[in-house]
């Protein structure tokens, strides 16, 4: 996990002693809401203005992290506990026309034209998959979701966030996209999620 801090009030920023660039996002939004190119923060003035604007707009604290410049992965997972398995790993690759450096709200909303999702299975992807599954199990997540990972400057995948209630739109949501690329039909994905929940309830 990258170094991080949480900002709710301007005074909180005074305590932040981290190396720039940093990355800012609301603590509890989905679909990239609040993430824009300005989320990559280069100095303290930007840190203050971006954080205070986010707190005001989204009415919640902001998480500040060391910016991770490497490859971004999202790992699909179905199942619970030791029965949790990866459905595949995709790399999120921003096209030239996309907003730079960040998997932003705009990039997600216009993913068909701005983002390439590539199913990957190289050593870095496998490392991301391993830690994503460990995070899923460690956090007690259930049935189906995603874990987002991004590599630091040394190529080490870092945990970014878990999505325990992911979007399941068959064409626009990341989890179904992963499954489709991995040869798992939408129907099978839904069946896996339901079967995991049924096993939990009737055991």
Regions found by a protein language model. Give the residues of each.
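Active-site flanking residues adjacent to catalytic metal/cofactor-binding acidic residues
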Residues: 24, 64-65, 147, 160
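Short connector loops/turns at beta-strand edges and beta->alpha or beta->beta junctions
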Residues: 27-29, 108-110, 165-168
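Broad gene-expression machinery/nucleic-acid interaction feature
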Residues: 19-21, 72-74, 146, 159
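Phosphate-binding site of ATP-dependent enzymes
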Residues: 43-130, 153-158
